[in-house]
Amino acid sequence: MTNDNTGQIEFWNSDHGLAWARYADAVDTMFSDITDAVLDAAEVGVGDRVLDLGCGNGGTTLAAAARVTAIGTVTAIDVSGPMIDRARERADAADLVNVTFILDDAADYPFAGGSFDKLISRLGVMFFDDPADAFARLGPALDTGGRVALGVWRGPRENPWAMEPVAAARPFLDMPPRPGPEDPGPFSFADPDRVRRVLADSGWRNIDLAPLDFHIPLGHTMEDALAFVMEMGPLSAPLGKVTGGNRTRAIDAITKVLEENTGDDGIVRLSGACWIVTARAG
């Protein structure tokens, strides 16, 4: 099997990709625990040559660039034009000269052999059509023994930040079918046995998964959190198609979930759960 990521490329270059680009700073705040855990697990340090897969708006890219300093390099790749544009803007604003962005599909991009010491990804590798093929192609891009660290979601039930608003609104919306557990999507790497199998079959070794549990700030105000949930993720399209009473009821149900998870400081937080996956190139 080979990768046909056409659907994902279309999706991330649609209005959805534009929305993620608009929320770049908020997303980095939400997922900062994952960023730190991935960079620590990869042991990114001064002088490293880093490849950032599915870099999105460049949050992990910029964080890695700070660690490698000017004598290291970070190459970042993503299929989303809107997010790559946003990432470049952010890198330019930070006067970074050791960062390169590539608008392309990492699954079959012709990286030169031995170009990198470290491979990192924050939530960017769960969308490959054929992940074993993708990781088999990526392996030679690292020096032998090069280290990979990936942040990937655990199961839906362990991620209330994503699922509780959906469950509350579902009775009032026409939701699309749930993807299968191994179909491309946010939870396709939730099964640790599958992750180990994919990486082992594609030539990686010393594979390990460590759990990361944390709280995700969906917004610093109730209004911000509600706007984020309505514009991003699985509820954005169904909410855009419904009108009248069902739309009102769906928004009321989402609001109730967010209110129940608002702290005394006004910040809306729900729990999230990831695997931090590490391995070495064969």
At which residue positions do the language-model features occur?
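A generic alpha-to-beta junction signature in SAM-dependent methyltransferases
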Residues: A42-V44, V68, L142, T262
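Conserved hydrophobic residues forming the short capping helix/wall of the S-adenosyl-L-methionine
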Residues: V68, A91, A169, L199, ...
